[in-house]
């Protein structure tokens, strides 16, 4: 797969995979944040992703991350919306979680 080099290319690559991601992994929602959204990514940047799942994945979460890395041709940093919400309950992490939430670009 061609390595996406812009925000739009990352979003398009993920959008093209949405039906499969929903069927295989139960992804209901996926969003990008971080350097690709800010426009500060480099050739070596990973892609920061957050997903909402319809079911727990357990160890299959690793398979999801690996699949997304194949699709994007880059390492991914994968989190869930559930984790983001839990982070907001920790005063030390709330500011970062709020910043991530404000910057999300949904697929």
Residue ranges, per PLM feature:
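Catalytic core of pol beta-like nucleotidyltransferases
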Residues: 1-28, 38-39, 43, 54-107
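Short beta-strand->loop micro-motif that forms the acidic, two-metal-ion catalytic signature
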Residues: 48-51
